[in-house]
Amino acid sequence: MECYKCGVSGCHLKITCSAEEKFCYKWRDKISNERWLGCAKTCTEENTWRVYNSCCTTNLCNP
């Protein structure tokens, strides 16, 4: 599977996940608006006053 990952030029870098990594995630700090994207072995969706995290299981589904 491939997911987007944050790198030097922003969050558009495409990476190939390892065999154990079954999820793409998108994590955002609602206060600072910082975000991180990448691959994960496990993923828990979260939407609180501070953090938003979404998980998905198809290629490049975390833009």
UniProtKB/Swiss-Prot annotation:
Keywords of this entry: Amidation, Disulfide bond, Neurotoxin, Presynaptic neurotoxin, Secreted, Toxin
Processing and modification events after translation: Contains 5 disulfide bonds.
Main subcellular location: secreted
SUPFAM superfamilies in the cross-refs: Snake toxin-like
Pfam families: Toxin_TOLIP
Residue positions where Proline amide is found in the record: P63
Coiled coil: none
Key word ATP-binding present: no
InterPro entries linked: Snake_toxin-like_sf, Toxin/TOLIP
Disulfide cysteine pairs (residue numbers): C3-C24, C6-C11, C17-C39, C43-C55, C56-C61
Tissue: Expressed by the venom gland.
GO MF entries: toxin activity
UniProt keyword annotation of Secreted present: yes
GO terms for cellular component: extracellular region
Subcellular locations according to the entry: Secreted
Function, as annotated: Unknown. In vitro, this toxin activates sperm motility when tested on OF1 male mice.
Family: Belongs to the three-finger toxin family. Ancestral subfamily. Orphan group XIX sub-subfamily.
Annotated protein name in UniProt: Actiflagelin
UniProt organism field: Walterinnesia aegyptia
